[in-house]
Amino acid sequence: LVGSEMCIRDSLYCLEVRCPQSGWMVPVLPTLVISEGHRVVARLVPDPVRKRYDISIEYVDAARWPEEKKRAEAQGTLPRVGKGTLVHSPDGITAYRTRMSTIRGDYRDEQGNNRNRLRPWEKEDIVPRPEDILQERLYCVQWIRETEEAGRAESQFRAVTEADLERERRVTEYVRAHLADWEAAGLLPDMKIEAGQETNRLLRERGWTHWRHLFNPRQLLAGAILRRHMTAETAPFVMNALNFNSRLCMWSVSKSIGGGGAVTPVFYNQALNTQNNYGCRGSAYLENILVSRLSVSPLPDVAQAEVLNRPAEQWEEDYDFCVTDPPYGDAVNYEEIYEFFIAWMRRNPPEEFRDWVWDSRRALAVKGTGEGFRKGMVRAFRRLAEHMSSGGSITLMFTHKSGELWGELTWIIWAAGLRVTASWYVVTEKDSALRTGANVTGTVLLTLRRAAGERRAWRDELEYELQEEVRAQVERMNGQNSRLAGEESGGLYQPVDFQMAAYTAAMRVLTGCDVMDGVEMRREAEAPGVRAAAMVDALIRYAQDVAEELLRPAGLPAALERGWNMLNAAERFYLKTAALEREGPQKLDMYTNMARALRVAGHERLMSAESRANNARLKLSDELGSGDRDPEDEWGGSPLRALLNAMRLLRQGEEAEQVLAVLAEDCRGRYALLR
């Protein structure tokens, strides 16, 4: 492409709906930011004659960018803070607000089922029909040309032109003309979307009835070409290309992704998420996915190994190492999302896959809840324990925020005659948007071996061991976060990751104990009694409390990092929860749990009066006012409380010298900590 004409890297599409109040066609855009890295925004230009908006694209200079970015985020027609409300103003004065549920025509039928007025698509539909409620429009194109400088490219985001629209029409007509032939040759999906927990949203939110509807005409054309030339060796890469080229591919504006905006994969969070706006890769830029290489770690030539795959309950041979990722809790509905790929593979697959059963076998899917699941897990791991060689091990992948499920897994491991001997945490989320707030950023790998000996311990002994184990784990993670605090990512780990680290530490200690407070745990695990279950749950909660007590916010100033342990519990509570608030709204129970872990009494006085169950926050310095400053009180007499009061005084216009004098008096002998 060097020296050639520019080609399309990405095409951006969005829904478009008619506002019932104004009669205008409105593009559905959560934000008008196109690219943070390139400082690009979209502008809605009213066209009163046609009662619709043209969309212009504008580059913003660095000096104006912070303000323009904030404005563009606020001017999206479906703002995230609007909770599903479409907002637009043709004249800049009158704002029309309509719930998307109203536009869709949501209602409940006589049986109480949620329904709407969206037309179910016919199999042959590849774009919305003119009468459909949800239309689709191209609103921006990113053009690119390679330069002679290695690794550099010239890129431009441009508004849509009549030439772009003509190309869209040509592609659509070409795909329509060849649809039947491609389907007959097995190059396109012909499979209907089966109802399910994950797949129901496709019909409910878009009216899609067949898997091909998840792809626009450009994507169907690219998919058919790739499918025609696919071999057994290239099949994984072709399927991954489809993962990056669907109507479900979110357009990320983040500077940390793609340098300034990129198409994210369908399964960035293992779900079928419909998008109000999405990105479509140009064919030339699917190449880097098609030519990617799998990471391999070959065994030494002297080693002889056989790799086997089968259900654990059917295992009959002895083995040395086993790797498993069992379902648990609200596990991913793999049996449903597999069908995204099965739809493309089932017709006329490469010769090597002829004997494969191209069916997701939903009826056989194991669900990770209930007594039946627990007993099935015990049987599976017991069978694996029986066939494990003397030095063998199982690597178990597990990730979940629920302490209850970690407790259940502990009982399963006990009942199977196994113990946790090692664990490590792998960060798997690279997207900064996913590495925030309550999102788990990785997965835990547990090493299981056969239980050895009969170790007896009392609860107070185990609490001491848990404290030491959790402390060592948290200090390692805090150290890594401190080293990375200067990076934009804000550190590797979020608070929920420390919580999971506490759970794994608890499992290492607990499963290594055979008799606890006189209770034989492996026998008890067959049907845990109330007393034993309560004791295990309490120890797991204790480990979580220890982790939360030790947790420090990422990015602390050096002086505060050194003096963190000098802060009292109320100060640490305020700083930790304030750090979490930077990631977005928090639930009220997060503050309650943190206060319990840090043993902070009366934390409610630090909470805003506006706090609700699903949207809570701390009081700001102005809201704290001048009260609650009793020098004998843990919070009222703390340097942090004094500092917040000083900030309030400065905001009110008090002289800096006078405020410093008040601050010094309030802090008395602890002023050095604040310098």
List the model feature ranges, each with a label:
Residues 327:
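Conserved SAM-binding loop
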Residues 392-398:
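Conserved beta-strand signature within the Rossmann-like core of class I S-adenosyl-L-methionine
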Residues 374-390, 415:
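A short glycine-rich, Lys/Arg-flanked "PGG" loop and its adjoining helix->strand segment in the class I
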Residues 4-320, 331-366, 380, 404-405, ...:
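Nucleic-acid modification enzymes, centered on SAM-dependent nucleic-acid methyltransferases
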